[in-house]
Amino acid sequence: MFYHRIAVNVPLSDGLLTYSHSEPLPPGTRVLVPFRNKTVVGIVWEADIAPDMDTARILSVQTAFMEEKPLPQSWCDLLAFTSRYYHYPTGQAVFAALPQGLKETRAVEMPQPPLFYALNEQGRAQTPPPARFNKKAALWDALLLGGMTMAALKQVNAQAARLIEDWAEQGWIETTEAAKPVLRSYHGQASHSEFVLNADQQKASDEIQTAFGSFQPFLLYGITGSGKTEVYFDAMAKVLAQGRQVLFLLPEINLTPQLLERVENRFADVPTAVLHSQMAAGRRTQDYLRAMLGQAKLVIGTRLAVFTPLPDVGLIVV
């Protein structure tokens, strides 16, 4: 029998309780455990420990959700720090940072990786659609570039799904999972804005880029309308083009449909997760997991989104 310290959402001194299981469970694994005559969700915090109590009194883990990917150790370390810093029980800190779907007692389906579409070698050898069919030709050109999701392709041509299905039946289309998104300005459906930075903006963006790959905070100072947004959009584009993740944190009041539309237009072909309290619980949980798995490259959210586990974060914009 193996013993584990498990974080549960209860107001204990540290919110960590000891449970047993027939095999060692990886830290970060979601489990169901008995607590005060009911079943609650827990997160494995420490595995294979030596208990400091009579083992006959230790209850067993009821269910371990082994098909779900464990929360990463870096995330556990961050929540442990948060708990110490704010003198708050670890278990309650952990569950404050989780989306609703991971607090419930049922299994969660893990999201599938996004598909990226492109013309294969046989497709590239075909004659492109005539220019007079401008939407169809635009879709063909986008597939020549490759690295675009179906959502992004539908912004180029609303009939993308049907046309791609037709071309796939002819053997002209290939799909890949988790390909690095290619940021591009494309027929007005711009993921890379046509806005040209002025000298001061370019200097600020260049300075930020010198710190890529290391930790360095920057403060953008400027009056309303001075173009700060374009500076951090430019920096975000550079990080995303490397295939790394960007976390974009906003106050709830600023997270408007207009802003989300602006971001979607700018980064149309980038897999994006949006995390805020107004989202449906199921969608928010799936977006959280997509971010954790590295499937979502751009993560937009309110302050609580800072606790989203990101395996390859390259830039945080606040």
What is each PLM-predicted segment?
Residues 1-318:
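Accessory, non-ATPase domains that flank or precede helicase/AAA+ motor cores in DNA-metabolism machines
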